Structure formats: C-alpha cells, structure tokens
Swiss-Prot record:
Its EC number is 3.4.11.18. It comes from the Eukaryota. It comes from Arabidopsis thaliana. This is Methionine aminopeptidase 2B. Residues 1-90 are annotated as: Disordered. One of its GO terms (cellular component) is cytoplasm. A divalent metal cation 2 binds at residues 223, 292, 325, 420. Residues 24-40 have a biased composition (Basic and acidic residues). Keywords: Aminopeptidase, Cytoplasm, Hydrolase, Metal-binding, Protease. A divalent metal cation 1 binds at residues 212, 223, 420. It is found in: Cytoplasm. GO terms for molecular function: initiator methionyl aminopeptidase activity; metal ion binding; metalloaminopeptidase activity. Its cofactor is Co(2+); Zn(2+); Mn(2+); Fe(2+). Ubiquitous. Preferentially expressed in roots.
C-alpha cells in the first residue's frame, strides 16, 4: 500500500522564503509522483512474477498429471471370446503363481529355509514357463465352460477349445502348444476318448463329460481336467472326485509315500453316494487309473499316484511335477480298453527301429517334427495335411515306436467323473499350478 511505502517523504513548508517554498513544493510533488510510478511498476512486476510462477506451477502440475496418466495406463484385458495371447496380457513376462500350500510336519522347516529359496531362484525360468501354460489353461477352460451346452457336436467343442489354446499360448512348433488331445469322454468312458474326423456325437443333457486337456511351454506340461454335467442329480458324483482330488493334493509332498495318498483319496471318494433315477450308488475309485509324475515332453514320467489303498511305497521327491487326478464311478470301479482308438503317442524311450514301409517312415518324420513324444490324435494328423495314414500308423504301433491309447471304459450304463490338477513340489512349498477360481 502507498501510505506504507518508505519512499514517500513528508516535508513541512518554510514560511519565510516563498520561492524556496514553491521550489521545494515542486520538487516534493515530482518526488511523490516518481515514487508512485516506481510503486506501480514494482506492483506490476510482482503481478507478472506471480503470473509466471502460477504458469510454471500449472505446467508442472500438468506434467505430473501426464506422468500419472502414463503410470495408470491399464494392461490389456482379455477379449470374449479369448483371442489375446497371454504374453501380451502380462508384459512384464512374469506369470501368476498357482495356489501355494505349505509343507507340514517334518518338512515345515523348508518354508523359511534360505538355502531352499536359493535353489528356487535357479529354477525360476522353468517355473515361469509352466505358469504361463497354466494361465492359458485357466483362461481357456473358463471360456469353454461358459459356452458348452447340450446339443453341441463333440467335434465342435474340441476344435473350439484347441483353437483357443493355440491363440492364447502363441503356438510355436514344439516350443509352445497343446500337450495332448482334448479328452471329452462321456458317461461310462473314463478317459482317452476324443472324436475322430467325421464323428457326429452330440452332447446330451444327461451326459457326464470329462474335459481333460493339456498345455505346454518348452515341454513343461500342465495336465488338468474337470467334469461337466447339466443334470443336477450328478452333483454328488462330481463332488466326490473333486473333493478326492483336493485330498490327494493336500496329502502330497516331499517324502510322502504314494500309497498313503491313494488311501486318503479312496476314503474321501467312497464316502459319497449318488442317486440316479431313483437308485442309490456308492461312488467308487477306479482302482486301475492313477495320477502320475510329469517330465519335460513326457506326460507319464514313471511314477504313478494311486487312487485306492495298497499302492507303491515309493516316495515323492523335491522338484517333481505331478498330475493328481481322481476318477469316481457308479460302475465296477475298473476300466478296460474299448471303442475306436483316437489317442497315440511316440514311446519316450523308443530307439532306432528299421521300418520297411516308406509311408511309415514318412509318417514317423511328421510325428517327430510336429509332436515328438507328446500325445496326438487322428484329427491332429488330418489338420497338418496327412491323408491315408492308418496303415502306416498301425505299422508304427506294431513296431513299438508309437503306443496306441484306446478309450478306457467302465461298465456300460455307468457314470464316471474326473478332476485333476498339476502340482509342483518346490523346495520351499507345494504349488498347485493349475488352480483357478473355478476349481
């Protein structure tokens, strides 16, 4: 304010000298006007400085907002139907862990062991690969469960599922893709059935369908299955195998004997009953079907996890992958090979076998290139352009190079349910790799 400015001088008039008074008055007036102009100029400069400071502040805020908006950039979301490869949904390259379960009793110390944590750091690339395969499995089965309904052709269900896997896993030869044919076994057929080309089987309301499919990255396999039934009368049958599988997973661990897991599974499975069309059945574990260890490019790596008591005394070991799967049946609880074969797999330990048929040699080269020791089905051979191959395929089977896996069936008229997860016995904990929100 001007009244507070120290530049304004107040001088008393001199009465004796009128000229001096007049001169002094003019000087005082000039000084006063000059002071006012200086004050106005200073005030203007302050306002300019304030405006510039305000602009600078606004500019900084805008930059911060821009930076914040960049940080808040959302990750891509999966489409419906799914079409975006999972590698694009996780640009960091790190894929979600499965469900972590701590070891118990004598192995509880592993949870906090620095030495064991260091071992896990070395295995991180493998863990990440198999987690990527598991994430694909979760997203594909979520979609398939939402679209499957009575009246669909089994071939359409399988091809929709398999094509979705190919997209989401970024299929790339033997580096990434489908690990084995889509099993969609119905009712008394427990496993290893998929439609061959031309099959016209239609899914019915009263069917019990086991959807068993696999994904892999660099041969690291996720083997995971679930059962679909539209009629609620089958709910207890599905619950039996689901809870039995959870029990098997809970019991599994480093140094656990395989026979103990089987006994625990059977106890839970056979505690269930199911009423079908007015008749009550006790659910039975299928005694000649098992879970199994998994190796790179090897779906059955040598160890079997029984689902009844009285199995092997062999122990599970650190670092192993296992498919824990259970089958509950209203039939005899025993399967046999039946129906037309669709599943085949090159024997993992097959050495060089001389082949006489040129067509068999050609087919073997195709199998080596496209599947190696991963399982395949006739539809997959059709898809890559193979024709008139049945005689050559039989020759490869007869020579012991390729193993056929016909459908496995309980008694006709019975119903079988299945649930399965892949687990990893890490040095510090047990990871249920394929676990999802659904099961």
């Amino acid at each position: 304010m001007a009244s507070e400015s120290p530049d304004v001088a107040v001088v008393a008039p001199v009465v004796e000298n009128g000229g001096a008074e007049s001169s002094n008055g003019k000087e005082e007036q000039l000084e006063s006007e000059l002071s006012k102009k200086l004050e106005i100029a200073e005030d203007g400069q302050e306002e300019n400085d304030g405006e510039e400071g305000s602009k600078a502040e606004t500019s900084t805020k805008k930059k911060k907002k821009k930076n914040k908006s960049k940080k808040k950039k959302e990750l891509p979301q999966q489409t419906d139907p799914p079409s975006i490869p999972v590698v694009e949904l996780f640009p960091s390259g790190e894929f979600p862990e499965g469900e972590i379960q701590e070891y118990k009793d004598d192995n509880l110390w592993r949870t906090t062991s620095e030495e064991k944590r260091e071992l896990e750091r070395f295995e991180k690339p493998i863990y990440n690969s198999v987690r990527r395969a598991a994430e694909v499995h979760r997203q594909v089965r979520k979609y398939v469960r939402s679209i499957v309904k009575p009246g669909m052709l089994m071939t359409d269900i399988c091809e929709t599922l398999e094509n979705t896997v190919r997209k989401l896993i970024s299929e790339n030869g033997l580096q990434a893709g489908i690990a084995f044919p889509t099993g969609c076994s119905l009712n008394w057929v427990a496993a290893h059935w998929t439609p061959n080309s031309g099959d016209k089987t239609v899914l019915q309301y009263d069917d019990v369908m086991k959807l068993d499919f696999g994904t892999h990255i660099d041969g690291h396999i996720i083997d995971c299955a679930f059962t679909v039934a539209f009629n609620p009368m089958f709910d207890p049958l599905l619950a039996a195998s689901r809870e039995a599988t959870y029990t098997g997973i809970k019991e599994a661990g480093i140094d656990v004997r395989l026979c103990d897991i089987g006994a625990a599974i059977q106890e839970v499975m056979e505690s269930y009953e199911v009423e079908i069309n007015g008749k009550v059945f006790q659910v039975k574990s299928i005694r000649n079907l098992n879970g199994h260890s998994i190796g790179p490019y090897q779906i059955h790596a040598g160890k079997s996890v029984p689902i009844v008591k009285g199995g092997e005394q062999t122990k599970m070991e650190e670092g192993e992958f296992y498919a824990i799967e259970t089958f509950g049946s209203t039939g005899k609880g025993y399967v046999r090979e039946d129906l037309e074969c669709s599943h085949y797999m090159k024997n993992f330990d097959a050495g060089h076998v001389p082949l006489r048929l040129p067509r068999a040699k050609q087919l073997l080269a195709t199998i080596n290139k496209n599947f190696s020791t991963l399982a395949f089905c006739r539809r997959y051979l059709d898809r890559i352009g193979e024709t008139k191959y049945l005689m050559a395929l039989k020759n490869l089977c007869d020579s012991g190079i390729v193993q056929p896996y016909p459908p496995l069936c309980d008694v006709k008229g019975s119903y079988v349910s299945q649930f399965e997860h892949t687990i990893l016995l890490r040095p510090t904990c047990k990871e249920v790799l394929s676990k999802g929100d659904d099961y």
